[in-house]
């Protein structure tokens, strides 16, 4: 149990998708203007990561890995296209659920909801799972931990950006300039967790 808690904490803080690997920055910067919208997208990304990493773990271990289906047959060259297909299917299901049950969040996320399919944080989580050879339980913990870390980063950024609206920011730094500086400072803060041994 301690191993899984350590893996979750490491995925949230030490190996944060947004602030350690800078993955998913397009939606991170575009949707982090309001806390409510950022939280909604963070939940969506967490759900997609939390489901797609273990599902892709099963697909990889039962079908694509060398010798999984038939001894001597290696289908690992299909990794990328298969993983993207699974992620796209999960995002479409999530989009239908949000449209049906949470129309205000669906409208607030707009074009960024289908873009979760090509969000490199999602694909990065799946790729790290394969690279690190996680088992199914580890991939569940890692998927939800990575999503939680990304959500924590985007909600914190949205909170800071809401406060920056009332700050006296120099004219040359208004907008994305101060946002990039803030992201860098947040990344430095999260970098302090890198020395923590769990």
Curated annotation (Swiss-Prot):
The keyword Cell membrane applies. Signal peptide: none annotated. InterPro entries: NqrDE/RnfAE, NqrDE/RnfAE_oxidrdctase, NqrE. It comes from the Bacteria. NQR complex catalyzes the reduction of ubiquinone-1 to ubiquinol by two successive reactions, coupled with the transport of Na(+) ions from the cytoplasm to the periplasm. NqrA to NqrE are probably involved in the second step, the conversion of ubisemiquinone to ubiquinol. Composed of six subunits; NqrA, NqrB, NqrC, NqrD, NqrE and NqrF. This is Na(+)-translocating NADH-quinone reductase subunit E. It comes from Serratia proteamaculans (strain 568). The gene is nqrE.
